[in-house]
Amino acid sequence: MLVSAAEMLKKAKAGHYAVGQFNINNMEWTKAALLTAEECKSPIILGVSEGAGKYMCGFKTVADMVKAMMEELNITVPVALHLDHGTYDGCYKCIKAGFSSIMFDGSHYPIEENVEKTKELAGVCKGLRLSLEAEVGSIGGEEDGVVGMGECADPKECKMIADLGVDMLAAGIGNIHGKYPENWGGLRFDVLDDIQKLTGEMPLVLHGGTGIPADMIKKAIDLGVSKINVNTECQLSFAEATRKYIEAGKDNEGKGYDPRKLLKPGFDAICDTIKEKMELFGSVGKAFE
């Protein structure tokens, strides 16, 4: 059974750890994430971008697949199925499809319109007991064709959005999607601290978790980050393991071309990456606390 992310993030906030959101892109990704969470006894948030949802034949297909896999694999840890960087229309599609959590990315709207739409969605989600994530200040890099410059959020605007009844808040603090450039200036902990002071107990979300040094991750958690998103790192791990398999000629050995064998190294690499992140975030063993 899927659950809202609200309760798991409240526990993470109180326990000074973070829950990982690991984006899924197909069956292998989903299975790897679920099995690793169960092995680690960690709560998990499965993220689905609108592009990934379209690739997997629609949000209902994704929701039905996740629910069926949880039942078949006997998954007992808390699992939230979360729309990542959702448009206004996309949020309603995911609500209808059976997602348990959504993110409305209104960061590209003027703050007044962001407030209006977020407030509306907060009311809808509260009535359905779904969790809602909002964003202030665009996250750098590219996500499904939307390019953000990575500016820092205004703490006062964060307070404005947090007071609308959302369950978690993503705020730009110099983080970006994808690989970080060599000249990246690092996370703005001063901005994060100001945001935390104004938003109180609100769980904060760190997007672009790939490539951020471990010490920065731990400091961000200390300053109130309770959810960390990881996508690119799993993709890179999958690609590298698959490349090695093919370059070693394994696909030409016996029935090594069978997709179930061909995709296995990449699957294992995703599992290893997720486990490594759960250990870093401190969520291992926290599923039933």
Named regions from a protein language model:
Residues I246-E289:
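Extended, intrinsically disordered, low-complexity segments
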